[in-house]
Amino acid sequence: MAESEKLDVSKLTDIEIKEKIDVTRRELFDLRFQRATRQLNETHRFKKARVQLAQLLTAQGERSRSNT
């Protein structure tokens, strides 16, 4: 993943992170559905969404641990 494509979660607020997590989970659901019905042509989007979700969840966990 190129440096310009990486998600910079350090600049996001907690609310924005939560919203992005919800959006990314919905995107993964849609991609899984497309894959199951063999309509998914851009398979790289699946990996990108999983990586983005992992980054967001990690940032959310780090912030919750640092706030307590």
From Swiss-Prot:
It comes from the Bacteria. This is Large ribosomal subunit protein uL29. One of its GO terms (biological process) is translation. HAMAP family: Ribosomal_uL29. The keyword Signal does not apply. GO terms for cellular component: ribonucleoprotein complex; ribosome. The keyword Ribonucleoprotein applies. InterPro entries: Ribosomal_uL29 (IPR001854), Ribosomal_uL29_sf (IPR036049). One of its GO terms (molecular function) is structural constituent of ribosome. The gene is rpmC.
